[in-house]
Amino acid sequence: MGTLIPEETLAMIGQRLSEPVTGTITSRDAQRFALAAGDRNPLYFDEAAARAAGYRTTLVPPVLLAWALNPPRPLDDLRADGLYRGEGKRVTLNVKRVMFGGEEWEFLEPVFAGDTITSETRLKSLEEKSGGSGPFVLQMTETTYTNQDGAVVARAVGRSIAR
């Protein structure tokens, strides 16, 4: 094998795929997300309930981290690989298509309304494999979410399948 992953792409493993993105998550953002998801947990809406539970203020629904730091942009700005034009390094593979293969999250610390979060995504691994319909590449990325105090609050490992 080895024909689907160019050498220069292998050299990208461990590198950052784009500049870090930083944003502050407001209570309004958190509450709107929770309502849209049908999650009426009082810890997202009621500061007194959050304090009674031992938190400093209301919490943020954990998966909101994936969306809160990326402002909406026109569909025409998207590249074929799902990234916006002018953003990030392209992971070049000798394949025709790439599809989402799942994502695993690890939530390490609570995120609070008003926290400023920075996300950073790196290419974790590239592995050429053989499947029933031929060779493919399993691509793994790792996104780390850090709060304003430098604490890592979450980590997401994403998988893409390229063939």
Show where each model-derived region lies.
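Hot-dog-fold acyl-thioester-processing enzymes
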Residues: G2-G102
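HotDog/MaoC-like acyl-thioester-processing domains
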Residues: M1-S18, F100-R163
